[in-house]
Design a protein with these regions (language model features):
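Alpha-helical transmembrane segments in multi-pass membrane proteins
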Residues: 45, 49, 53, 57, ...
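Residue-level detector of conserved catalytic or cofactor/ligand-binding positions
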Residues: 342-353
Length: 354
């Protein structure tokens, strides 16, 4: 009888809430209670909630070895999303180094006219958001440029800001490079491109309605107040650092084609990275990525590029392409979030309590 395995019991409602309360408490401590401490990330509160959840599970009769096995089993189901996020870092770096994103921005800014500033600006923010996979990056970079252009046209800053945020978030949600898009697909245990396609039915009509309204409002803008120097300075900065060509948009087209064909995420991104890397070696100066030596190419994909143009907006965009190294913060957060919210609570049945 001594070798019989102890039967675990179901935790009470209050006991099941302990890990959640602990996580909230540690987050409040880090973000509000002791802001002078210098730690403002969510990682350690999640780690502490995992520790508390393990203690609660052990108190209810679960063996630590069984809990660990349960975590590993459930974590393996999410590894594809984590691997995709790693390769997304390669994709962002290769797109930037190849000149794909700079070319996209340069040609997009050519489309700006006073009457179409609002709808075209929204579309450009969506495109840039898709290309770089970050609504915040889009808002903080080209979005700031559009605020300056909008001010020159005499447009209400709140309206311009709404246009920027609308486009940036639409682009972020449709982007296979976005960390939140990958996280949503991982939590839902669905394919990345399936998740992106599923959002078209809800986000697509919303974008169309917004563009119609922006077009109507744009027709009332005074075209004589338009100052093209802000957009021109960004274009000149990119042209000075990169070779700009329509051909360099091909890597971005490859991603779109992979999404339409519903190619598995890892395969589609790998093909796009290979395409962009080849274009980088053919078209761009070695000043951008060091040399054609394999080590420098690996360095670019891992850590990104360090190009400076002298233009604040352009440099901010370029600075976001940090390669795989730039995705590690998000990957760590995703793993800890999955462990604390799913992989601990499910094996110990804490998630079943209501």
């Amino acid at each position: 009888m001594a070798n019989e395995k102890k039967v675990a019991r179901e935790p009470s409602f209050l006991l099941a809430l302990v890990p959640i309360v602990a996580m909230i408490g540690f987050m409040l401590y880090c973000f509000l209670g002791h802001s002078e401490s210098g730690y403002h990330d969510a990682h350690m509160p999640l780690v502490m909630s995992i520790v508390v959840a393990c203690i609660v599970g052990h108190f209810c009769g679960h063996d630590f070895k069984d809990m660990l096995s349960g975590m590993i089993e459930r974590l393996s189901a999410s590894m594809e999303a984590v691997l995709i996020l790693c390769t997304v870092g390669f994709l962002v770096a290769s797109f930037m180094a190849s000149g794909a994103i700079p070319s996209l921005i340069v040609y997009g800014l050519d489309l700006l006219t006073p009457k179409l500033f609002l709808p075209v600006g929204c579309i450009l923010c969506a495109i840039v958001g898709m290309a770089c996979g970050s609504s915040w990056t889009t808002t903080a970079t080209i979005g700031l440029a559009f605020l300056g252009i909008g001010a020159g046209l005499g447009i209400n800053p709140a309206l311009t800001a709404g246009m920027i945020i609308s486009g940036a978030y639409v682009g972020d949600k449709f982007s296979p490079l976005s960390d939140t898009t990958n996280l949503a697909a991982a939590v839902a245990e669905t394919g990345l491109f399936d998740h992106v396609t599923a959002m078209v039915s809800s986000t697509g009509p919303t974008l169309v309605i917004a563009l119609i309204l922006y077009t109507i409002m744009g027709l009332n803008i005074d075209a004589s107040a338009y100052d093209p120097t802000v957009a021109q300075s960004i274009q000149d900065a990119f042209r000075g650092a990169f070779v700009i060509s329509p051909v360099l948009l091909i890597p971005i087209i490859v991603v779109i084609v992979m999404c339409i064909l519903r190619v598995p995420g890892l395969v589609g991104i790998a093909i796009s990275v290979a395409t962009a890397t080849i274009f980088m070696m053919i078209f761009q100066s070695t000043d951008i990525y060091g040399s054609r030596a394999l080590g420098d190419i690996f360095n670019t994909l891992h850590y990104g590029i360090g190009v400076e143009t002298g233009n604040e907006v352009a440099d901010s965009i370029l600075g976001k392409a940090k390669g795989m190294d730039g995705t590690m913060w998000t990957i760590n957060l995703i793993l800890l979030a999955l462990l604390s919210l799913i992989h601990i609570s499910e094996p110990t049945r804490q998630a079943e309590i209501s």
